[in-house]
């Protein structure tokens, strides 16, 4: 079975290939000569993930899966949530400031730490949440994973991506996710949990019928 993973992120692609190695050949759209983007216009992780899966299914003509991830910070009422990748832009727009580039995670982290500084004494508990949408044989299936933790006071570590330098997972309370080896991070990651749930579903519902 061959599945398109709707991502251009090499780290995500490597993680998915490791988890699905015995079940499916995972290819990226770029490996099929597809470089178009699909707009993430949904208001929830589930909506965005299925929008991407549908879009790339149409572009590639193959069964497809896609993910969307958000960061939920309790002291900020669940923000940035589904808007994690453009949080700095959202806050700059709110405050009438110049807009930083899209997907600028250095600016996003600065904005997150700044917003939390306005909540002294509030718990810094947070979670990453990933939803994976699988479009297979015309049917849509969804899988979810979370990683619980807290937001650090400052950046540490150079690994990972996104908010990893300021996210401390409950499983490793003495370091940021950006300081964890890749294999350790993948073992506990929100996306990894969602992908493993998808792999288990494929094993139980597809492979047994082949």
Show where each model-derived region lies:
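Anionic-ligand binding patches
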Residues: 2-4, 11-210
């Amino acid at each position: 079975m061959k599945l398109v993973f709707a991502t251009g992120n090499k780290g995500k692609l490597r993680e998915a290939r490791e988890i699905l190695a015995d079940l499916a050949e995972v290819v990226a759209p770029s490996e099929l000569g597809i470089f178009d983007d699909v707009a993430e216009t949904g208001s929830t992780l589930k909506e965005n993930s299925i929008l991407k899966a549908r879009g790339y299914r149409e572009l590639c003509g193959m069964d497809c899966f896609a993910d969307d991830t958000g960061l939920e910070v309790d002291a900020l009422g669940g923000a940035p949530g589904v808007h994690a990748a453009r949080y700095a832009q959202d806050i700059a727009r709110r405050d009438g400031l110049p807009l930083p580039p899209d997907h600028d995670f250095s600016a996003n982290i600065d904005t997150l730490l700044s917003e939390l500084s306005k909540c002294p004494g509030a718990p810094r508990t947070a979670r990453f949440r990933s939803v994976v949408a699988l479009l297979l044989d015309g049917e849509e299936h969804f899988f979810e994973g979370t990683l619980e933790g807290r937001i650090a006071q400052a950046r540490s570590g150079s690994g990972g991506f996104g908010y990893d330098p300021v996210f401390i997972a409950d499983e490793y309370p003495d370091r940021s996710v950006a300081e964890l080896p890749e294999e350790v991070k993948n073992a506990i990651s929100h996306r990894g949990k969602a992908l493993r749930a998808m792999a288990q579903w494929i094993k139980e519902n597809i492979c047994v019928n082949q």
